[in-house]
């Protein structure tokens, strides 16, 4: 159930004002999705996050699938993340939209998101003066 939070961050945090810049919270989110504990989120782990969250197995996350996990982990902050992640505005987050978010976080393009990449991208995005980042 907790697995969709990183997907949310990977997809959406790069385009909106996040609810927190707290290092402890960022670390907690990262560790929840570093499934094998190697201090990196691989593309395989990102795919697992998406598939686990896709409860009806239709290849996309609807608002209910997204919000049930997001609300559990971040209370009421899921809505802006969903709206930004839904790049084509069809009310669903398709797998390709999830991959776009992953690519944005993977700064060195090695198909893994390090703790540093995750934290830096999150922090750059939530700065009050930051503009939305397109990916």
From Swiss-Prot:
Gene Ontology cellular component terms for the protein in this record: extracellular region
InterPro entries: EF-hand-dom_pair (IPR011992), EF_Hand_1_Ca_BS (IPR018247), EF_hand_dom (IPR002048)
UniProt keyword list: Calcium, Metal-binding, Repeat, Secreted, Signal
Gene3D superfamilies for the chain: EF-hand
Signal peptide residues on this chain, from the entry's feature table: 1-16
Stored SUPFAM superfamilies: EF-hand
Annotated positions binding Ca(2+) 2: 106, 108, 110, 112, 117
Tissue spec. comment: Component of the acid-insoluble organic matrix of the calcified shell.
Binding of Ca(2+) 1, residues: 34, 36, 38, 40, 45
Places the protein is found: Secreted
Lineage of source species: Eukaryota, Metazoa, Spiralia, Lophotrochozoa, Mollusca
Residues annotated as domain EF-hand: 21-56, 93-128
This protein's name: Insoluble matrix shell protein 5
GO terms for MF: calcium ion binding
């Amino acid at each position: 159930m907790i697995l969709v939070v990183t997907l949310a961050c990977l997809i959406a945090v790069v385009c909106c004002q996040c609810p927190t810049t707290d290092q402890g919270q960022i670390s907690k989110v990262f560790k929840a999705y570093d499934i094998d504990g190697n201090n990196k989120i691989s593309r395989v782990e990102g795919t697992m996050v998406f598939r686990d969250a896709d409860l009806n197995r239709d290849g996309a996350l609807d608002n209910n699938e997204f919000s049930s996990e997001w609300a559990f982990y971040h209370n009421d902050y899921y809505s802006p993340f969903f709206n930004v992640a839904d790049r084509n505005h069809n009310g669903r987050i398709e797998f390709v939209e999830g991959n776009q978010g992953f690519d944005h976080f993977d700064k060195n393009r090695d198909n893994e998101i390090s703790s540093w990449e995750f934290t830096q991208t999150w922090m750059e995005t939530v700065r009050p003066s930051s503009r939305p980042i397109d990916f």
